[in-house]
């Protein structure tokens, strides 16, 4: 995945990694209404901030609704997925770097 380039992540979901640091990185993600980010986990801590829209997250079996201006912390190794309830845009911040997304 290229830095500062949009990439199709899943149907109705595109993402762009902004210039990463040494230990932290930020990724912008845009969802069409009804689009989903499949459930997964990773050893990285994640902070997600909703720039626009409304999304329903499942985090370790609990539903968390996120609207514009709200954020959520996703702990290391937590199983999580998301569904956009309307067109949405968010920022994900990861530490340490998500090497799996950078390579």
Give the positions of each predicted feature.
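A short, N-terminal "cap"/entry segment at the start of jelly-roll beta-barrel domains
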Residues: 1-23, 103
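Conserved short histidine dyad/triad with adjacent acidic residue
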Residues: 27-41
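Histidine-centered metal-chelating micro-motifs
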Residues: 36-37, 56, 72, 76-81
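Glycine- and acidic-residue-biased ligand/ion/polar-headgroup-sensing regions
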Residues: 44-45, 49-55, 60
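A cytosolic small-molecule/anion-sensing beta-strand core signal
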Residues: 51-52, 67-68, 86
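Structural motif
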Residues: 54-56, 63, 79, 89
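Short acidic-glycine-tyrosine-enriched beta hairpin
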Residues: 61-76
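Ligand-binding loop in jelly-roll beta-barrel domains
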Residues: 76-100
